C-alpha cells in the first residue's frame, strides 16, 4: 500500500500456444492492492488474446482492491478469441471486494472479449460477499463487450453494489443481466441504469437484444426489484439519449420510491407500471399509454 500518494498498477496477460489464465491483473484471496490517505488508485489490465479461457482484464477473486480515501478506477479489457470463455473485462468473485474509502468515488470500466463463448461480460460481479462499494462516494460501472452474445454488465449470485451515504450509483451499458439475488443499493439516493450508446432502445419488462443496430437494453421486473433507491432512473436524455422506450411487461420496482424514465424518443407503455410515490417521464417525443400507471 502507499502512504498517501497515487498508485497505478498496469498488467498485460501473456501466454503461448494453448496456455490459459492470461490475466492482465489477478488479485487472489489474501492479497490486496491499496492506496493510503487520499491517494488515488488506478488499476488497468488487459487479458491475453489467445483462443483460450480465463483471459480476463482484471480479476479480484477473494482479494481486494481499495483506497483509504481517494478515488478508485479500474479499467479492464478482456481477451480470448474464437469460442473461448471467461474473457470478462473486470471480474469480482469469491468474496472479492473493490471499494473506495473516505470520500473516494469508484469507477469501473470493463470491455468483454469478442469471443463467442460464455462469461465474456464487460463487468461481472458474482458470489456471496463479493462487493463493489464506497463509504461516502459515488459508483459508476461502465460495461460493454466486443461480441454479441454477452451482457455489458452481469451481476449474479448475491453480488452487491452499494454506495455509502446515499450517493449515486450509475450503471452505463447497452445490456444488463441481474439475477434474483444480486443487488444494487444507493440507500435513499439515485440509481441510474442508462444506455451507453446513443439511440439504444430500452425495453422495461423485456430482454436485452445483444446484436444488430440499434441494440436494446432490457430490464426485467425481477432485475428492477433488486434495486434500492430513493429514485430509480432508467435511460438518459442528454447528448447520448436513449432511443424509443417500451414497457412490454408489468414492472413494479418495489425497493425504489420513485421512478424516472429518460429518453430522446417515443415511449409506449403497453403494460402496468406500479411505483410507490412518483413516476416521471422525461422523454423527447410522444407518450402512448395502453395500460395502468399506479
Language-model-detected regions and their locations in the chain:
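Extracellular lectin-like interaction modules
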Residues: 1-294
Amino acid at each position: 500500500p502507499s502512504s498517501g500518494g497515487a498508485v497505478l498498477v498496469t498488467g498485460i496477460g501473456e501466454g503461448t500456444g494453448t496456455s490459459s489464465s492470461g490475466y492482465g491483473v489477478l488479485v487472489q484471496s489474501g492479497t490486496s492492492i491499496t492506496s493510503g490517505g487520499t491517494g488515488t488508485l488506478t488499476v488497468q489490465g488487459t487479458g491475453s488474446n489467445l483462443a483460450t479461457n480465463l483471459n480476463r482484464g482484471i480479476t479480484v477473486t477473494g482479494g481486494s482492491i481499495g483506497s483509504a480515501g481517494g478515488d478508485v478506477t479500474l479499467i479492464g479489457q478482456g481477451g480470448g478469441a474464437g469460442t473461448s470463455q471467461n474473457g470478462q473485462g473486470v471480474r469480482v468473485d469469491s468474496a472479492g471486494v473493490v471499494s473506495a474509502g473516505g470520500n473516494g468515488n469508484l469507477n469501473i470500466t470493463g470491455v468483454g472479449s469478442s469471443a463467442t463463448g460464455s462469461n465474456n461480460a464487460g463487468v461481472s460481479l458474482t458470489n456471496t460477499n463479493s462487493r463493489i462499494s464506497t463509504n461516502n462516494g459515488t459508483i459508476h460501472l461502465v460495461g460493454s463487450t466486443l461480441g454479441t452474445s454477452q451482457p455489458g454488465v452481469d451481476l449474479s449470485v448475491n453480488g452487491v453494489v452499494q454506495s455509502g451515504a446515499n450517493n449515486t450509483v450509475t450503471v452505463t451499458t447497452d445490456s444488463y443481466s441481474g439475477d434474483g439475488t444480486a443487488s444494487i443499493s444507493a440507500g435513499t439516493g439515485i440509481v441510474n441504469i442508462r444506455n451507453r450508446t446513443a439511440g439504444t432502445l430500452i425495453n422495461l419488462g423485456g430482454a436485452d437484444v445483444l446484436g444488430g443496430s440499434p441494440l436494446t437494453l432490457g430490464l426485467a421486473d425481477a432485475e428492477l426489484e433488486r434495486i434500492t433507491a430513493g429514485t430509480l432512473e432508467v435511460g438518459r436524455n442528454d447528448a447520448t439519449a436513449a432511443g424509443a422506450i417500451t414497457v412490454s411487461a408489468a414492472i413494479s420496482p418495489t425497493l425504489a420510491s420513485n421512478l424516472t424514465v429518460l429518453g430522446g424518443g417515443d415511449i409506449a407503455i403497453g403494460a402496468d407500471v406500479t411505483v410507490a410515490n412518483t413516476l416521471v417521464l422525461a422523454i423527447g417525443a410522444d407518450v402512448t399509454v395502453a395500460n395502468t400507471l399506479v
